[in-house]
Amino acid sequence: NDKILIYEDTNGDGKADKETVFADKLHLPIGFEFAPGGVYVSQEPHLVFLADANGDDKADSKEVVLTGFDSHDTHHAISAFAADPSGAFMMCEGIFLHSNVETPYGPVRGVHGGFYRFSPQKTKLERTSQFGLPNPWGFAFDKWGQDFLIHTSSTTMNWHLPLTLRGDYGVSAPATIDLTPAGQAVRPTSGLEFISSRHFPEQVQGDILLANSIGFLGMKQHSVVDDGTGYKTAFRHDLFKSTDPNFRPVDHEFAPDGSLYVVDWHNVLVGHAQHNARDPLRDHVHGRIYRITYPSRPLVKPVVVDGASIEALLENLKEPEDRVRYRSRRELREHPVTKVIPAVQKWVASLDINDPNYPHSLLEALWVTWGMNAVDSDLLRKCLSNGDYHVRAAAVRVLRYNFNKFPDTLDLLKKAAADEHGRVRLEATMAATWFNKGSALEVVTIAKNKGVDGWSKTQTDAAAARLQGKVEVKEEENPMPPIPANLSDTEKASFTAGHKIYFREGHCATCHQKDGKGLDPAFPPLHNSIYVHGNPDRLIKLTLHGLVGAFELNGKKYDGQVPMTPFGGMLNDKEIADVLTYARNQFGNSASAISPQQVTTIREATKGMTGFYRMENLLKEHPLEK
């Protein structure tokens, strides 16, 4: 009986003192977003709309809007909803799912990880991006409408635009640059938010915040600055971290007063594959919400949003805080389009063109008309030709979702493709793949001839290939390393097969990392590890049955709180032999190969074992070599 709860601070002391159940009898509502009249919620295999008809903060009805989202691996299901400036929202979906959703515009299918975009105004679902990501639980938009994401199961953070070229079912977009600063890789990440609050120091505005819930238990803060077509990041600091081993920060958002709210799932068990669904240690009562303030700076005085007039809501769009503008745009969509559009036009006419924030205000006005499903043509053209490339790039995004409303769409895209700034050109290139007409290739060609960089070259080539019906040749993501010469032909074949198993999603590289160096303090390295190149029986046992609890390796302590997955039920004896042969002859290790017969013998000898190994018990059976 999962619920959506409303917490209120009625006396302004910074602590919740009122709880309202908006909706109950739900099952795993792992994504939701507000819309006029209610809330969209993930209820796999459905996307449902919970309507509050009388404004009493309680859902009165439930409508299944779409169905067919895969649910057989629930923690990969549609989640972490994030609204774009129009009010359409992105939905994250993990790698192990195969969704087939019937929509008014035809079926939408997704596989192998990616993002959907649902537009409530049009009841339209789109598979916006398809690429090699494992399990995304974080998505965020910056003040200019550019979107960013985290991979969760891996340590990667990406700018989303380069991944949004239209593709065929099951065909992934080429990988793009990882924005995670060197030395700051953590996993599993969850929740993503840009700092946009006058309550926080000026120098950190625009920084990005991401939470992590295993190993490093806290929140990373990185600066994000423009860098050519794309961006570059730098580690700012850890905004907070905890020594409570059950602390699990999973989401965060800025409040109307500029403070930051953080959701702590707070659970001793975090592995879905390692623990029984009904394990009594699963914690259903200790979830928390924290509020973070900056004591030496005043809180932001909240502006009126709920119940405000159209004119007041438009004035709110001048506020510096992203979340204030987000909530004001959402409130504007509650009003009739026949009243909002004339008010927007009047508001734009009243703006001071000499105001440094004029370009952004112009863009906000365009976004309001987009959200009303009535894009203002004059506003769009003003933004497409604005002197600020951020505005021009954002305007191309608006055009990309409104092709059919402008007879000169192709000409507008061509002009954007010839823009002086690479970000505008990349927006035009990605948009052209969705234009889906032969003439769209002209747009990509113009952009390529104008110039590409590390952010756009591969993506532009892929866009051209797809528009010509070609299958782009991708570089091997995890190239085969040199095979040790001392192995026999049979062992070399085993090493090669083991390399592929090592990099399977949810297998070895997920925790121990691609380079075998692990992630302190949760995931130990395989690099030069006595547990890998030492006694083969010990290694086979922990691979078959998993490992839990603290232990020490090469002078470092690992908490072992999240158990190593027991692979005995996931891999057969040959597969285990292959991947262990690979690990024992890679990452600085050099040891004998493992045969399937060795695995079979150990499996038979330990078939009565239940639960995980603990290192102290394993070492009693197989002491470390001296």
Model segments located where?
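Short cysteine/histidine-rich zinc-coordinating motifs and their immediately flanking basic loops
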Residues: 130, 519-525
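Sequence/structural segment immediately N-terminal to covalent heme-attachment motifs in c-type
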Residues: 491-519, 532-545
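Electron-transfer interface patches adjacent to heme c in soluble/periplasmic c-type cytochromes
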Residues: 506, 525-541, 545, 549-553, ...
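Extracytoplasmic/secreted proteins, especially bacterial periplasmic and envelope-associated proteins
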Residues: 312, 327, 339, 394, ...
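Flexible coil segments in periplasmic/lumen-exposed cytochrome c-class electron-transfer proteins
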Residues: 472-493, 553-554, 558-626
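Extracellular/periplasmic ectodomains of large secreted or surface enzymes and adhesion receptors
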Residues: 180, 184, 236-250, 254-501, ...
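Beta-propeller domains with acidic blade repeats across secreted/periplasmic ectodomains
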Residues: 1-313, 331-333
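Detector for the c-type heme attachment site
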Residues: 294-295, 511-519, 544, 548, ...
